[in-house]
């Protein structure tokens, strides 16, 4: 009976990961959409990612403690409700035409995603004893399905409802801002429906079913966890930085409009989806850390080629990085939380805080891009910022993942 419950739980969690990916990737549509509406610089536009991923740092530890008390199943329900609230706030934000309101709504929405992330990832690993990395990669493939469909959804329902002229009136800009209202209202309704479904399913609280430990080391005494949390920081920062500026790079270097450029995001995030489905199969034969090292090295090579070669080849190389990003988050997470026992929920909260890399790295790249724009230099040099992130991931895959003998 327990095995059936665990299988049902894993299956239902695919909806959670799908929604997280779908909503998160819409930020890559919001940046080029809101930039001309509010006359933003690259740095100001990147504040969308700062507010969204900043919520991970502020709320990750909070939800880690909350979920350790209420359990993973109720943590999932709570996450969906908060997410729905944030999505609904996009309606008044667009109505008043306030960029600050948009950022506030994004923070609340992101807080819901943080709660889902904090509950969902360890939930999967605890349901998958002996197959933690493989099953988390498989379930997160549905996260990538969401990130693949998100740009299509966003470009059709948001960009198609906007005007393309560079000299829009204030009224036209407000009308363009309102194009996000119905899509996000729909996401709010969908989130509430998922909250109801998860509540009615009565998922098993696997952590409470684990035997209590008489002694417990400090979470931060586990070096593999500390290195892993930093790995998540740099992975999310690098991935989000590339995704955030990919559309703007295509616009600038290939003279494509925003809607056409957004289609390339499908290849970036779609590559991650393909890589995760493939990775879940290959991890039966390849050690997770070795697979991670190969993908990190491949990403380094692709970004370096993009910077050195430039042109169409560079942008296609950056797009292909998405494929190698595929297994990084679930693999780093599973390696970092391995054998942590009852510290797992708190560890997940700290790792959720580490996702703040997505808030800090893109603005750094934004500042570098603004500097390069001012001096009319090659914008691709700014991709040196995410390049450095992948070097750390390579370190974690080769050495940082190792547990101490007495862990």
Swiss-Prot record:
InterPro entries for this protein: Glc/Gal_transptr_bac, MFS, MFS_trans_sf, MFS_TsgA-like
List keywords of the entry alphabetically: Cell inner membrane, Cell membrane, Membrane, Sugar transport, Transmembrane, Transmembrane helix, Transport
Organism domain of life: Bacteria
- What is known about what this protein does? Intake of glucose and galactose.
- Protein name as it appears in the record: Putative glucose/galactose transporter
Q: Does the keyword GTP-binding apply?
A: no
Tell where it localizes.
Answer: Cell inner membrane
Q: Which GO terms describe its molecular function?
A: D-glucose transmembrane transporter activity; galactose transmembrane transporter activity
Q: GO BP, one example?
A: D-glucose transmembrane transport
Please give the family membership noted in the entry: Belongs to the major facilitator superfamily. FHS transporter (TC 2.A.1.7) family.
GO CC term, one of those recorded: plasma membrane
User: How is this protein positioned relative to the membrane?
Assistant: Multi-pass membrane protein
Asked whether the keyword Membrane is assigned, the reply is: yes
Which stretch is the leader sequence? none
**Transmembrane ranges?**
11-31, 47-67, 70-90, 96-116, 139-159, 180-200, 225-245, 263-283, 300-320, 321-341, 349-369, 378-398
Task: Kindly give the Pfam families that the UniProt entry links to this protein.
Answer: MFS_1
- Spell out the coiled coil positions from the record: none
